[in-house]
Amino acid sequence: MKITKAEVDAVALLARLELTPEETETFTGQMDAILAYVEKLNELDTSGIIPTSHAVPVENAFRDDAVRPSIGVENALANAPDRVEGFFRVPKVIE
């Protein structure tokens, strides 16, 4: 499959990237090489391979919940530039 400059421009638009003509040319070649490699992988016989989502078995890695002491409000706010009633005060970001 041959990638065109128009396709690279379309992907750049979706990614909100502004590419120079030189970058478009470079990425066209790179994307074409990537897809050529994927096409080569499609030639492999995978009929006896079971589909998987992980290469190795994954088990739940979470630990049991345990109540432990925390650093406390005063220590957490010790270096806060501004605080109010035990909370961080931050600039308003919603208009």
UniProtKB/Swiss-Prot annotation:
- Does the UniProt entry include the keyword ATP-binding? yes
Q: Which reaction does it catalyse?
A: L-glutamyl-tRNA(Gln) + L-glutamine + ATP + H2O = L-glutaminyl-tRNA(Gln) + L-glutamate + ADP + phosphate + H(+); L-aspartyl-tRNA(Asn) + L-glutamine + ATP + H2O = L-asparaginyl-tRNA(Asn) + L-glutamate + ADP + phosphate + 2 H(+)
Q: Is Protein biosynthesis included in the keywords of this UniProt record?
A: yes
What pairs make up the disulfide bonds? none
Instruction: Set out the biological process GO terms recorded for this chain's protein.
Output: glutaminyl-tRNAGln biosynthesis via transamidation; regulation of translational fidelity; translation
The molecular function terms of the Gene Ontology recorded here are: asparaginyl-tRNA synthase (glutamine-hydrolyzing) activity; ATP binding; glutaminyl-tRNA synthase (glutamine-hydrolyzing) activity
Which Pfam families did the record assign? Answer: GatC
Q: Which UniProt keywords apply?
A: ATP-binding, Ligase, Nucleotide-binding, Protein biosynthesis
**Enzyme nomenclature, EC number:** 6.3.5.-
Q: Which NCBIfam families match?
A: gatC
- Purpose of the protein: Allows the formation of correctly charged Asn-tRNA(Asn) or Gln-tRNA(Gln) through the transamidation of misacylated Asp-tRNA(Asn) or Glu-tRNA(Gln) in organisms which lack either or both of asparaginyl-tRNA or glutaminyl-tRNA synthetases. The reaction takes place in the presence of glutamine and ATP through an activated phospho-Asp-tRNA(Asn) or phospho-Glu-tRNA(Gln).
> What's the subunit arrangement here?
Heterotrimer of A, B and C subunits.
Q: Which family does it belong to?
A: Belongs to the GatC family.
Q: What is this protein called?
A: Aspartyl/glutamyl-tRNA(Asn/Gln) amidotransferase subunit C
Lineage at the top is: Bacteria, Pseudomonadati, Thermodesulfobacteriota, Desulfuromonadia, Geobacterales
Q: Which gene encodes it?
A: gatC
